[in-house]
Amino acid sequence: MSEIIEVCKKNQWNFVDYVFNNEDKELYNYLSKILSAMLESVKRGLSASGVLPGKLGIERCAKNMYLKSKSIEDDHEEFKVRLMSYAYAVSEENASNGEVVTAPTLGACGILAAYMYMMYYDEGVSRRKLINALAVGGLFGNVIKHNATISGAVGGCQAEIGAACCMTAAAAAYLNDLNIKQIEYAAEIAMEHHLGLTCDPVGGYVIIPCIERNAVGVLRAVDAMTLSKYMSKIKENVVNFDTVVRTMKYTGQKLPLELKETSLGGLAQEVSIKGVDHD
């Protein structure tokens, strides 16, 4: 990322300029399709009810969560619950074999989509602006993929939820008119505070703890953006994005096999649910 920032400085580009000056012209149309798919996945998830497939017997929550948000008087809490309901909606669609966008993976598909949905339908941000935000988020996701991993089986959940939170924080920072260094700072914060997160899905399903982690992840992305926006005016960040990505890779290599998508340890072994065999 440091090299990309240097190119941007040299050419007086922002991250959007960098992406579209280095990618095929069809990328914009592709990202437009991605945005549409994200928005539709939230819509479907908010309208669906019933039990998620598999042995866990988990009820869908997104619809009721969204309806509950409408009765919350505290604006701050209403915002949080509403945004989390969007993340639940997409993650529950994924758990039900619905069409979602891997951003960057299925296990973390609800974070960026939830934020895009909120900004489009609740905040009235234009499609063009959101497509540009996807380009920025995707840039950070690709750096993670190239220099480390986005696979829970390789790096634990820090590589999935952590990367998705990072991409969303970067997109959010762009949408809030933060500069290049502030965007990098937001992405770094988002990844740094997911370091060491294990991947231990109960029963092997992308349900527990995955769905709830998407809801928490989108809130963390907003927090990372906000912290960057104001802390960057107080002090210079000591840890840069490249450093935290290298650290994530190292941490993932040190995580035991039991905590990297195998369901052989962690919550997958501790949570007892009827129909799930821990042997």
Regions found by a protein language model. Give the residues of each.
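Generic N-terminal targeting/processing segments that precede catalytic cores or assembly contacts
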Residues: M1-E99, M118-E123, K229-M231, V238-D279
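Hydrophobic faces of stable alpha-helices that mediate helix-helix packing
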Residues: L35, K80, M84, L134, ...
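Short amphipathic alpha-helical patches
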Residues: C61-Y66, G110-A114, M118, G124, ...
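Alpha-helix capping and helix-loop boundary segments enriched in small/acidic/polar residues
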Residues: D74, E78, A103-L106, R128, ...
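Glycine-rich anion/phosphate-binding loop at the beta-strand->alpha-helix junction
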Residues: S85-L197
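Functionally critical mobile loop/hinge segments
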Residues: A172-D279
